[in-house]
Amino acid sequence: MLHQLTLAEIARALADKRFSAEELTRTLLGRIRQLDPQLNSFISVTDDLAIAQAKAADERRANGENGALLGAPIAHKDLFCTQGVRTSCGSKMLDNFVSPYDATVVEKLAAAGTVTLGKLNMDEFAMGSSNQSSHYGAVKNPWSLDRVPGGSSGGSAAAVAARLLPAATGTDTGGSIRQPAALTNLTGIKPTYGRVSRWGMIAYASSLDQGGPLARTAEDCALMLGAMAGFDPKDSTSVEQPVDDYLAALQKPLSGLRIGLPKEYFGAGLDSRIADAVLAVVEELKKLGATVKDISLPNMQHAIPAYYVIAPAEASSNLSRFDGVRYGYRCDAPQNLEDLYKRSRAEGFGSEVKNRIMVGTYALSAGYYDAYYLQAQKIRRLIKNDFVNAFAEVDVILGPTTPNPAWKIGEKNDDPVSQYLEDIYTITANLAGLPGLSMPAGFVDGLPVGVQLLAPYFQEGRLLNVAHQYQQVSDWHTRTPAGF
């Protein structure tokens, strides 16, 4: 069953010539055609490109190359620019946009030999926590087809969880890798801000966005992140720091690891069954040699209001470039330039995107800048300081990834704040720029739940190490949704 293999298993099998990259690619493309109509996880399937890349990978291997990702099939969240392939960002605005270049992440993974099966569905312009705001329709959670897979990287999560492919790229602005990973039983990592290049990654909130992988295991995430990470002179926020050997980091024993449990993560609003699952993970980590300490992150309560000022403010600026002039959707028969701008944007953007543009424009407007935007940035500094203080005492911070398991499609549509609250545990890592990882922690009523790990800047290896060691003594990550 080729579709059940992890990236690491695929690497070993290709090296042993048990099958070819082309054979694997054709198998998974057939699986996507057969099963994705149930999920709606792909916006574009790139059959011809994938088969050409698979043949090239087989040729490279025949010539003596043996990279871990050579011939590995993946797909990209549809906000990474891909040369010659539509890059829609889940929006009508970019429905006809074919990128003339590859994003750095796409380029780096292609250089490592990966095979691109297609582009994955997402919340429009990455704005959402449930993958319901996409112009191409909602993505369904393979664990329960009437429920959301999380967002905004919901297509990436659903496709990997349903074994349509072993790994995918995602992006995380307020939890958009970690939250869908938790709701679909995957491992997903948001690297430190500046660790992975944002060049060619269509921006939502530039000071918060960060690309990363979703896969089934920490080992697979280590393989992906090793290829994605690194300095990029084309991205002014990219950090010139050597990339750790994430695979080597996996093997370290956890003896002496200090884990912090923030009391704010276990308060009102958390499903008690998720709290039990998280504490069961803590007990296993203690058996592996870790010690546990209660800590406090006192400013966490202000994270959601601060985030929903900063992110929309940056979005209102970033999305001003979509005006119907150079590329993207253009309204029919505009009367004049102003009419072109107004109607192209009114018709091209969906309601959630328009909501956030309006909030952001308001927060940045002359009379309100100090009261909202400046205040939110001050709170951001306090949140960052809380983490600096906490990491003086502990090595990793652990808690739930989400307060609830996946909810039903449409259930929270009339109450956007209840959707925003699903990101309460993930947003702080983006505001502070810290690395965060979600890994499978069990099930509640048959629905997956995740545990989140946070570490100091550029300590992705430590997160992957803890997750990998836990996955050696647990089997949650091996469970597959029925029918897939």
Curated annotation (Swiss-Prot):
Its EC number is 6.3.5.7. Keywords: ATP-binding, Ligase, Nucleotide-binding, Protein biosynthesis. The keyword Ligase applies. One of its GO terms (cellular component) is glutamyl-tRNA(Gln) amidotransferase complex. Belongs to the amidase family. GatA subfamily. Heterotrimer of A, B and C subunits. NCBIfam families: gatA. This is Glutamyl-tRNA(Gln) amidotransferase subunit A.
